[in-house]
């Protein structure tokens, strides 16, 4: 058994050094290319409307606010200023969402975003996005990359298609630090020792983002009140939780396997599902010794088996917001196909470590 485990870890490390590193290098090259275009478009937006200031900056060869959805699909989070006059309200009525309401006694005119405040005093995510979409459309026509970039039509999201190969969503957002959403109050679970009080304090201080995008749970049937809501996102908190042991290596292997074998019709699975299941695996195996390099094979198998279970139950709860189902709206047939394909993949890795050479 130990010999088999060692063989799997050896093959996984080989897979990581060959396949995963090649994927990372290719994506890094794409990101540089994509960010040149996006920066140019955002510079043009800022000229027209100084409230939308580009926050896309390179730090230690990484772009702040850039999320990789898939090798040809990205999201850039554009951080907006001055949320101060609004109260953050999440009463759980919209899973995964919250609203920003003008603080009592504050005048609308005190807000930088005065014309996007609804009659009831809410800062409308939809109105801000609509204005931003108009500005981006104008910027695309004026920017120096206008021959290679165009807006994606038929969506309320702000999406660019670059060189007919890549899609980038640009999402206006507010960064919320020093507060923690009520809808995530159950985290961390009292009976689970991971991640420990110090890391919990760091994560909660890191806070979360509020994104102006279509809510998971409402796609296609939004009332105007609901579309004024903001989507909760915890990217920085999640990344902080995955910093030690072989967690990041495990995520890299999962993303590479997804890109190569689980890119399926109906798009049932994305990288975020992999990240979510990795976080649950951290809770199941709370000791740092469980995340030693020698345990990489066991952790990977555990996550793939959990993924199959989620696909069969057609439910994948968000890590911080368990009332939010990340499979919401996915076609059942696509989830079924993904379950079968994941099972084939897990069986192959488990029964024959050398199969990773071909995967």
From Swiss-Prot:
It is found in: Nucleus; Cytoplasm. Belongs to the mab-21 family. GO terms for cellular component: cytoplasm; nucleus. Required for eye morphogenesis. May promote the survival of proliferating retinal progenitor cells. One of its GO terms (biological process) is lens development in camera-type eye. This is Protein mab-21-like 2. Disruption phenotype: Severe lens and retinal defects leading to lethality. It comes from the Eukaryota. The keyword Cytoplasm applies. Keywords: Cytoplasm, Developmental protein, Nucleus. The keyword Cytoplasm applies. Pfam families: Mab-21, Mab-21_C.
